[in-house]
Each structure stands twice: as structure tokens, then as C-alpha cells.
Amino acid sequence: MLPARCARLLTPHLLLVLVQLSPARGHRTTGPRFLISDRDPQCNLHCSRTQPKPICASDGRSYESMCEYQRAKCRDPTLGVVHRGRCKDAGQSKCRLERAQALEQAKKPQEAVFVPECGEDGSFTQVQCHTYTGYCWCVTPDGKPISGSSVQNKTPVCSGSVTDKPLSQGNSGRKDDGSKPTPTMETQPVFDGDEITAPTLWIKHLVIKDSKLNNTNIRNSEKVYSCDQERQSALEEAQQNPREGIVIPECAPGGLYKPVQCHQSTGYCWCVLVDTGRPLPGTSTRYVMPSCESDARAKTTEADDPFKDRELPGCPEGKKMEFITSLLDALTTDMVQAINSAAPTGGGRFSEPDPSHTLEERVVHWYFSQLDSNSSNDINKREMKPFKRYVKKKAKPKKCARRFTDYCDLNKDKVISLPELKGCLGVSKEGRLV
């Protein structure tokens, strides 16, 4: 299982947490493979004559032999070995087992492992966070991330009851075992029937603030507000919603942000661009002040961005940024879920990411590799079909999804290159949504 939401990585070593962001070619996990797994001969191994050598697996069960473990793993590819021998506590919960396994992995040098948080009863807490990436997200009772719930530099609001209205994303509105309700992501405020989910604190704050100023019109969320304005907005929001753990920006003279920002209730701190407040990927720390540049600013490359003023056909005015933000957030959550679903002891490893890449760039590289099934370095017409379905399902407003692939195809050659995908998703070298 795995995470998503709060701040981000610092050193190249810590970047290894995103080793799994971009699956190695030739190691793709597909739905059909799981569907036919029961017909695999390994799934029906006869283990009665094998020598008993107990194995404790990640599902909390003790398997009497490697044969029995392989048979179970055939049916559940995410299954991993915790240790040789029987599980010490046969009644230990899945969360506690995964936590123990992760803590063991974390002892290895250069490993930035996600360690799940468990409740007193051994169940997964509704909110899970990754210390090094700074992402937090909502999970189901069995620890699976809820699509679209990942956020950064803020704790997500996860409801503990099943909503009457089924959610459009995944199965997050369904009971898992008939006894525990599946938590859902509360995305408030909701405007014009569209959920607003954003991967960054500043986008969400701008949308919330604009909605309060004008209930019928959301202003252009690309506008950058001064730190003083953001601070005042956050203070007002915190006063109205004291239990939501709002981040209150710390300001410097002239409307700038202080280079270090912290979230008091979680203990996380991170570096920001002093002119926009944008968190810098890779700088998140907990209970320790990060070392930040005193005058890091956004680079003015917008004039060279061909997508900046490019019209997205059919998308309501002022909604393009909101649409792209929600799409990138969904991709980030799904990437994290892909990392979680990879068996720790499995043979397939994800390729190591470029240390110079921002998190947003890694998300785009990861998704591009998923789509580029023939490794041609572009997304052709056939490969574009799942992309279209994904955009239509995950991103909002829906009207913006209809012509999005045409919008991405900048040179109109009927294929989408990696630079084009980066551009239409608003990901610059600095990792900002441009």
C-alpha cells in the first residue's frame, strides 16, 4: 500500500522514494494479467510433499512452505515476505505487519520507505503521510489510497462514513467488508457541481478565497497573491474551520514569503519560493528546520511556454488551470498507489528517477511510460485511447476533457511527445503549474 500529501524530498538519496515513480519498461502490471492468474499452474501447486519451512507474509498469515507462499502470491501479486518463520503474532493486523516490514526496510541505507500509521486497534489511520515526499492522502480500511485525495502541505479531510452519493473515482464510497465504512475525500468547497482537488496548497487556498469573495465566479486561479493576502485568508479559514489544520504562511516584508514554512500541527517544514510561496520539491523535513535559499524565486519562463495562452477548446473561461491541476493531482495519487501495490520483495524494480527532476516531472514521466506501450517515445492514436478515458474520468470540469488530447498535440502530428505532455499538463522544469 502507499501514500500521498504534505511537502517533498531533499537529497538525491531521499529521491529514492520515487524510484518507483517510473516503472521500468518491460515490467508493467496490467489488469488482464491478474484476471488470468488463477489459471496459472503456479496458482494450483500441490504442496503436500514439500518440506515445511514457515514464512510470515505481508498479509499476516504464516505459510508452511515456500510452495504455499508462491501459490498465494500467484493469486495476490502484492504479497511479500516479512520474514522467515511463523508470524510472531498470528492475530497481528495488516497495518502493523506492513508497518513492521517498512521499518525493517527503512534501516537500509539510502532507502526512503513509506511507513504506514496504525490506530490503537491495529487498523490503518484514515490519513496516511509520507515523511520524505510530504504527501498525505485518505485510505480505505485496508490501507488502499483513495484516488484524488492526495494533497501536499496540508492534512486531507477524510470522512469516516459512507456517502449516499457514490463517488465517481474508484470504489471509495463502498464498504470494504460490510462492517467498516470506507472513508472518502471531502473536497470543499464545491462549485458548479465540480470537485476541486489540487496537488498544492497555494492553488487550493486561491480557489477557496475566490469562492468566498464571489460565490458565482471563481477568479483566475493563476493569479499570484502576496504572502500577506494569503496569510489573512488562511487565518480567516482557520477561524471558520479550526479542526482542518490550515497552514498559516509566515511572511517577510514587501509581501514576500519567508523561505521556510511550517505546519505546526504535523511538525513538517519545507522551503518555498519567496515570491509565490510555492513549495520546493525535495525540501520537506519533520521536526527539523530545512536549509533553504533565502531568496529563491520563480523563474520567468512563461513567455516561452507555448501552452500558456493556448486555448483549450470547450473549456469554460478561467477553468483551464483548475482542470489541469485536478488531472495532475489524480495522476500523482495513482502513481503513489502504483508504488504501494508493488511487492517489496518482487523481482521487478522501478527505474531510478533523474535526481534533477521535480516531483511533477516524475509524475509525467511515469504516466508517459505507462501510455507508451511500444517504447516509441510518443503516444500514438491507439495509445491515446486510455489517456482520453483517464482524462474524462479523473479531471474536472468535464467540458475541458473533450478536446484535451488535441490541446496537447501542439504540432498537430497526431501523436503526443513527452515535451508536449509536460507542456499541456503545465509542468515546467521548476515543477510549477505554468
UniProtKB/Swiss-Prot annotation:
Domain Kazal-like: 37-89
A Pfam match: Thyroglob_assoc
Subcellular localization: Secreted, Extracellular space, Extracellular matrix, Basement membrane
Residues that carry a glycan: N214, N374
Disulfide cysteine pairs (residue numbers): C43-C74, C47-C67, C56-C87, C95-C118, C129-C136, C138-C158, C227-C251, C262-C269, C271-C292
Region span, Disordered: 149-191
Post-translational modification: Glycosylated.
Composition skew (Polar residues), residue ranges: 149-172
Sites where the protein binds Ca(2+) 2: D409, N411, D413, E420
Domain EF-hand: residue ranges: 359-394, 396-431
Domain Thyroglobulin type-1: 92-158, 224-292
PROSITE patterns tied to this protein: EF_HAND_1, KAZAL_2, THYROGLOBULIN_1_1, THYROGLOBULIN_1_2
Alphabetized UniProt keyword annotations: Basement membrane, Calcium, Developmental protein, Differentiation, Disease variant, Disulfide bond, Extracellular matrix, Glycoprotein, Metal-binding, Microphthalmia, Repeat, Secreted, Signal
Gene Ontology biological process terms, A to Z: cell differentiation; extracellular matrix organization; eye development; limb development; regulation of osteoblast differentiation
Function: Plays essential roles in both eye and limb development. Probable regulator of osteoblast differentiation.
Descriptive protein name: SPARC-related modular calcium-binding protein 1
Originating species: Homo sapiens (Human)
